[in-house]
Design a protein with these regions (language model features):
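Membrane-embedded transmembrane helical bundles of large multi-pass transporters/channels
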Residues: 1-245, 250-402
Length: 402
């Protein structure tokens, strides 16, 4: 999605605010009314846990964004999307099992990640001197395609996995519905709110654009250490893969999910190497975390759900990073060094913000009484942190020239 479409879209919305606000309120009421007419598809206790996680993430966002209004917007939009998904599930007559509730965790993290990338870009453009309406258009231009691709890969991956494992069918429905409503909110609800309600002005910081590059330069002072880390990481990854294969109940859904996501990225990006890097980066983080997690406790078998849920979440940040990487690669500054520099300076901070918020939210869910939710939340938390380290520090440090 390039060109002027985002500016035209924002102008159309700005000239039709009353009609759009009416349509938004009617749509929200229709979706949410399912909760009152048909009843909630999940238990009240699970809803309280998820809402508590959202509240904690929004509280932390006040500090990370230096903006009370931005944190409030995150909470309101994420909650509206979540209630909209529950309402639609109620209208469809879907009653979620305890395993399927994990899909709601995926939806919440997906929505939060999408909003963080969109709002971080808005604040960055405003700090560079843009009026908020122009900043919204520029943010949509930069993030609409990565967010769409992120939602599609997550939905497509769960759908393919569900084809081979029937217990994932409900999860695929929930994730698909959440991804659809999430994207509609990104391109309609959020711009509509930002066209009617102004955020605080935030002065940009040096670390927003150059913080990660400075850390990478420090890592490059020890080239032998970096080379040793490459071989050590590859060795650990190989050992971890062999170790996990002994306990996995079925690897077919996982393998097909990975292949489906890679094919989708390849079709959109037209670059099989970058697509493969995005998939392998996410997979490596999850495999290493799962090995460490299950090596310290007794385990007889591991369900594919424990691997698929974090993979659907961790892959999102990889898509955002490599979308910017590919944007530079297809332009004039197309060397690996310049591509990493552009990706780090443009999307490094939003990825780090997303990682911190998701870590806090997943930590709350890590105390959930249900074993499935607790286990998947903790594994996803650790995998998110490790994936961010690989994407933002390790990979650039290895490929950038000193």
């Amino acid at each position: 999605m390039n060109g002027r479409w985002a500016y035209y879209w924002v102008q159309i919305m700005a000239h039709n605010l009353p009609i759009l606000w009416f349509a938004l309120m009617v749509g929200l009421l229709l979706m949410a009314s399912g909760l009152f007419v048909k009843g909630s598809p999940i238990q009240l206790a699970d809803a309280i846990w998820v809402l508590g996680s959202l509240m904690v993430m929004s509280g932390v966002a006040i500090k990370l964004f230096d903006s009370l209004k931005t944190a409030g917007l995150l909470l309101v939009v994420t909650s509206l999307i979540w209630f909209g998904v529950l309402g639609c599930l109620a209208w469809l007559g879907v009653s979620l099992t305890q395993i399927s509730v994990l899909a709601l965790v995926v939806v919440v993290t997906l929505v939060m990640g999408n909003l963080v990338h969109l709002l971080a870009s808005v604040l960055r453009e405003m700090a560079r001197g843009a009026f908020q309406h122009d900043a919204v258009a520029e943010s949509l231009k930069l993030n609409a395609m990565p967010i769409l691709l992120s939602n599609l890969t997550t939905t497509f991956g769960f759908s393919v996995a569900a084809f081979f494992d029937s217990q994932l069918i409900e999860m695929a429905w929930v994730v698909g519905l959440g991804a659809l409503i999430s994207y509609l909110a990104i391109v309609t609800w959020v711009p509509l709110i930002l066209l009617s309600w102004f955020l605080e002005f935030r002065v940009g910081h040096y670390d927003d654009r150059h913080g990660f590059l400075d850390v990478v330069r420090k890592m490059q002072r020890y080239p032998r250490w970096l080379q040793a880390m490459v071989w050590l990481s590859l060795t650990l990854l190989l050992i971890s893969g062999v170790y996990l294969s002994q306990f996995m109940v079925s690897l077919i859904p996982v393998a097909m999910m990975l292949f489906a996501c890679w094919m989708l990225l390849w079709l959109v990006w037209r670059d099989w190497q970058v697509s493969l890097m995005a998939i392998l980066t996410s997979l490596a983080a999850i495999v290493l975390v799962l090995t460490g997690y299950f090596s310290v406790q007794s385990v007889v078998q591991i369900s594919a759900v424990v691997l698929i849920v974090p993979l659907g979440i961790v892959l999102d940040d990889s898509i955002h990073y490599f979308s910017r990487y590919l944007r530079s690669k297809q332009g004039f500054f197309n060397t690996a060094e310049n591509c990493h520099r552009y990706a780090l300076s443009s999307v490094g901070r939003p990825i780090w913000l997303t990682t911190q918020l998701l870590a806090v939210g997943l930590l709350v869910l890590g105390f959930h009484p249900d074993e499935w939710i607790r286990q998947a939340s903790l594994v996803t938390l650790l995998a998110t942190l490790l994936a961010s380290y690989i994407i933002l520090l390790w990979l650039p440090a290895f490929q950038l020239k000193s």
